[in-house]
């Protein structure tokens, strides 16, 4: 009996690696889409935090400009610009992750039709 189970296992493995037996890809694509959506949400949260940080730096810069301390004002302005650049980068990463999730959902739909 063990010999037959082993042979059956080998046959299933061989046919699976040759592509004759398709594993259920739908669940895999759905999991990947969920992971990409979670990643996008993480990037969007980071972008929100960086935007808030940039706003704080801008306020500080304005305060120093009112006090005629232009070196400090320039420093805070540079930090604000840097934070905004990072936020834009995070948003582009989030968009890429959302696009990948959407593609995985499309693949999952196609896999269900087969």
Regions found by a protein language model. Give the residues of each.
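Extended amphipathic alpha-helical heptad-repeat regions
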Residues: 21-114
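Classic N-terminal secretory signal peptides
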Residues: 1-21
